[in-house]
C-alpha cells in the first residue's frame, strides 16, 4: 500500500496528521519559505509526543541549495542534533553551483546521519541532470527522493516521476508538490509508492486585536494573522483513497 507522508509545521499539526492516518511526518518551519529547519524546542516536543515516524527537514534558509561554509556547518550540527534526539530519518539536500549534487558535502551529511534514513528533498527538482543525480544519490545511500518531476507541481511532472521510478537501482521516489485528494488517484495508478502532501490550509489567527498596517516581513502585504495548519479531514480522505486503491 502506498505510504502517505504529511508536511507539518508544528507539533499540533503533526499530532493531527498522526490521528488521521498519516504514515510519516516531514517536520518543518516557515511554510512561506518552503520549509526550514525546525527549532530545537519543536524537535524535542514532537519527539516526545508523536509516535509515527517523523523526519525533520534540515534546511537553514530559503532560496537555492548551494550553501556557504557557515551554512553547511549549521546543517551538519542540525543533522547531529536530529540523530541524537532519536529521530528515524531526516530530509535535506545540497547542490553545487552547476546544479549537480555536492557529493563531498553530501558524504559528510551521510556520515553525520549514520543509520538515519535520509530523504533528498526538492533540491532534486533544481538539479541539472535528474538521471545522473539519481545515480549519485543511489551511490550515497540516500533512502528516498522527494520530487515534483522537476515541474511546479507533481501532477505536471508525473511522466518524469514515472521515468525516475523505472530507473534501475534508484532510491524510493516520493511524489510531492500539489498532491491532494482530488488528484491522488493519478499517482496511485502510476505506481507511486510514497506520496507527500501538506494536506492543509491557511487558518485565521484567533487574535481579536489586529494592527493591520504592520508586517513582520519584507513583504508589506504579508498576512500576519493567518497560519498554515494540517486539515485532519484532508489527511483522512487521502488515507481512505489509498486504502480503497489497495483493495482493488
Curated annotation (Swiss-Prot):
The keyword Cytoplasm applies. GO terms for molecular function: copper ion binding. Transmembrane segments: none annotated. Signal peptide: none annotated. GO terms for cellular component: cytoplasm. It comes from Escherichia coli O81 (strain ED1a). This is PF03932 family protein CutC. It comes from the Bacteria.
Amino acid at each position: 500500500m502506498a505510504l502517505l507522508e504529511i508536511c507539518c509545521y508544528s507539533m499540533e499539526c503533526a499530532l493531527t496528521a498522526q490521528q488521521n492516518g498519516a504514515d510519516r511526518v516531514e517536520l518543518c518551519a516557515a511554510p512561506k519559505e518552503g520549509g526550514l529547519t525546525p527549532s530545537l524546542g519543536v524537535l524535542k516536543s514532537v519527539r516526545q509526543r508523536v509516535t509515527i515516524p517523523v523526519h525533520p527537514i534540515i534546511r537553514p534558509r530559503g532560496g537555492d541549495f548551494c550553501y556557504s561554509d557557515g551554512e553547511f556547518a549549521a546543517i551538519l550540527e542540525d543533522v547531529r542534533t536530529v540523530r541524537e534526539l532519536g529521530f528515524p530519518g531526516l530530509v535535506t539536500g545540497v547542490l553545487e553551483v552547476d546544479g549537480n549534487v555536492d557529493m563531498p558535502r553530501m558524504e559528510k551529511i551521510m556520515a553525520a546521519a549514520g543509520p538515519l534514513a535520509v530523504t533528498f528533498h526538492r533540491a532534486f527538482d533544481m538539479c541539472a541532470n535528474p538521471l545522473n543525480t539519481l545515480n549519485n544519490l543511489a551511490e550515497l545511500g540516500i533512502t528516498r527522493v522527494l520530487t515534483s518531476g522537476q515541474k511546479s507541481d507533481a501532477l505536471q511532472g508525473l511522466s518524469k516521476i514515472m521515468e525516475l521510478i523505472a530507473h534501475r537501482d534508484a532510491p524510493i521516489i516520493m511524489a510531492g508538490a500539489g498532491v491532494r485528494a482530488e488528484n491522488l488517484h493519478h499517482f496511485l495508478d502510476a505506481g507511486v509508492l510514497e506520496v507527500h502532501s501538506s494536506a492543509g490550509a491557511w487558518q485565521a489567527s484567533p487574535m481579536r486585536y489586529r494592527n493591520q498596517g504592520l508586517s513582520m516581513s519584507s513583504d508589506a502585504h504579508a498576512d500576519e494573522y493567518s497560519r498554515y495548519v494540517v486539515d485532519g479531514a484532508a489527511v483522512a480522505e487521502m488515507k481512505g483513497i489509498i486504502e480503497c486503491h489497495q483493495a482493488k
